[in-house]
């Protein structure tokens, strides 16, 4: 079968723009997410907060669970593969998954190589902390990006840091001449053509969502106002007191991110948010955002 072109895959990811993608671990949660207005769900055996708490090696989810979630909803279904584990990605493609997330939330399988995403028909989403990581992933074939944040913490600070880093670097590029762009591309180890394209257009060549620590409607609106194209919510919904209501509220806040009155209204009476973790209290070797290169 002919491989889809990268442009086609980028177009598929564009269709999710402005939406919320939710982590789910059961078909019932997937249905709650769909009813709340999620544009896609991420099928997982454990949400990031549980992966962080339980430790051990985190791998691709059981295909049976992924297929059960796929059958439960009509919206697109994503699933995670380990960084560099192209066989997990091949399995997910064979299962008919709509998007594959090469994710630092799982334990990396290869400490030198990311997956060559051009070899797959399915669009990939990858995490990034800065413009260099973003453009290196695009060069490998990623059709969609997201901030890494610090998953499973309920703490939005790292997602904010990564979003601001990407957009401030894009603004810097726009003031550079050709010689400076060449040097900059070399320094961030990204292809010059991609760097030049970003400098000319003032934006990334693919959609960029926020992920990692988003727990409230206000968190979602904050990242949208910073310039992201949509949000991933992992542990923040189903680790909270009233998941269905919080899911609807986060969708509303993402849609109406520039309307404080609406965000204030949907934020009322949501029950207990997930218990968060202070980033400085996490041992350095347990930081998920550090995975990948």
Swiss-Prot record:
InterPro entries: Aldolase_TIM, PdxS/SNZ, PdxS/SNZ_N, RibuloseP-bd_barrel. D-glyceraldehyde 3-phosphate binds at residue 164. CDD domains: pdxS (cd04727). One of its GO terms (biological process) is amino acid metabolic process. Signal peptide: none annotated. GO terms for molecular function: pyridoxal 5'-phosphate synthase (glutamine hydrolysing) activity. It holds the Pfam family SOR_SNZ. The keyword Lyase applies. Pathway: Cofactor biosynthesis; pyridoxal 5'-phosphate biosynthesis. Keywords: Lyase, Pyridoxal phosphate, Schiff base. Catalyzes the formation of pyridoxal 5'-phosphate from ribose 5-phosphate (RBP), glyceraldehyde 3-phosphate (G3P) and ammonia. The ammonia is provided by the PdxT subunit. Can also use ribulose 5-phosphate and dihydroxyacetone phosphate as substrates, resulting from enzyme-catalyzed isomerization of RBP and G3P, respectively. NCBIfam families: PRK04180.1, pyridoxal 5'-phosphate synthase lyase subunit PdxS. This is Pyridoxal 5'-phosphate synthase subunit PdxS. It comes from Roseiflexus sp. (strain RS-1). The gene is pdxS.
């Amino acid at each position: 079968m002919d491989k889809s072109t990268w442009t086609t895959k980028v177009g598929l990811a564009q269709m999710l723009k402005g939406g919320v993608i939710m982590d789910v671990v059961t078909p019932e949660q997937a249905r709650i997410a769909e009813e709340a207005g999620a544009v896609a769900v991420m099928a997982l055996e454990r949400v990031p907060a549980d992966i962080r708490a339980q430790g051990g090696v985190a791998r691709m989810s059981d295909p049976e669970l992924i297929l059960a979630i796929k059958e439960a909803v009509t919206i697109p279904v994503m699933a995670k593969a380990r960084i560099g584990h192209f066989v997990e990605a091949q399995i997910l493609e064979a299962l008919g998954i709509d998007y594959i997330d090469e994710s630092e939330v799982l334990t990396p399988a290869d400490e030198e190589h990311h997956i060559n995403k051009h070899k797959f028909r399915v669009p990939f989403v990858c995490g990034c902390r800065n413009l260099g990581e973003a453009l290196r992933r695009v060069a490998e074939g990623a059709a969609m990006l997201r901030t890494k944040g610090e998953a499973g913490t309920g703490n939005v600070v790292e997602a904010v840091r990564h979003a601001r880093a990407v957009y401030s670097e894009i603004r810097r590029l726009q003031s550079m001449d050709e010689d400076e762009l060449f040097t900059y591309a070399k320094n961030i180890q990204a292809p010059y053509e991609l760097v030049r394209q970003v400098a000319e257009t003032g934006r990334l060549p693919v959609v960029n969502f926020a992920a990692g620590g988003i727990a409230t409607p206000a968190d979602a609106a904050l990242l949208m106002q910073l310039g992201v194209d949509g949000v991933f919510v992992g542990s923040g919904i189903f680790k909270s007191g009233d998941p269905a209501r919080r899911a609807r509220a986060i969708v509303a806040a993402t849609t109406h991110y520039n309307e404080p009155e609406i965000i204030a209204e949907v934020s009322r009476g949501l029950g207990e948010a997930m218990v968060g973790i202070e980033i400085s209290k996490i041992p350095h070797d347990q930081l998920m955002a550090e995975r990948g290169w």
